[in-house]
Amino acid sequence: YLTGSLKSKPDLSFETSPSPKLKNILESGLPTESSPFIKKLLKKFPPSELYGKSVKDKRGGKNNIHSWDIELKGAVTEEEKQLLNILLKERRKKKWASEIGIDWMDGMPLTKAQISTFYKHPDLQNILDSLTDKGYLVLEHPKQKIGGQRIKDESLPKGYNIVSGKKSFEINKILDPNDVAPTLVAMDMEHLFVVDNGGLRTLTGKEGLRLFGYPDDYSFDIPKKDRCDLLGNTVAVPVIKAVSERLLHTL
């Protein structure tokens, strides 16, 4: 937050206090959501193992679930999973940008020859074809940075890249009730889920308000999408109150 005062500098040093856990503001026993995606997710992982997990194909990490982990786009063999997990990291290495002849970007398509340097398999082409047919990989030209945009360079050979992007899946993250809530932004609010009743659901309006320090009797009866947009752009009431009280002392 930016603050200002005309004559004296306000004291904005605050004592730290124990962070409240997400479970302190969650409701329970509410209806959960059902979709092919959620069914596949719960088939592979019990709810208790989903706490704090993100669902993305752009990065790795122990707290990340990939689409191939739940076979979202079709069944995959152990060899196909292994290739996807290795390619996920390799395609971000800066050496490939130099070899391809492009500026580095977070995820570059690699040719079969390049892939074969770190994943040696006699049936590599069939594995690549299978993953491309299922939609886990895409065969595309590398991109050049032109005028601040990434434009496909058709003069360069096509390579295999993992299909990914922002908001690729209906769930971005399953919040951990035993941890603090992450930063909430308008773009992601609809894609944050919690475990409840043995299933998964999005945050309720009351829970969203509680996260920002609003009282339970605050009126907020608006459509879900509008609610998520507003909450994702709001401020934490207790923080504003504390800062405002300090500023008042300078008047």
Label every PLM stretch briefly.
Residues N63-L251:
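C-terminal target-recognition/interaction regions appended to catalytic cores
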Residues Y1-G74, E78-L88:
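Flexible, glycine-/basic-rich loop-and-beta segments that form/coincide
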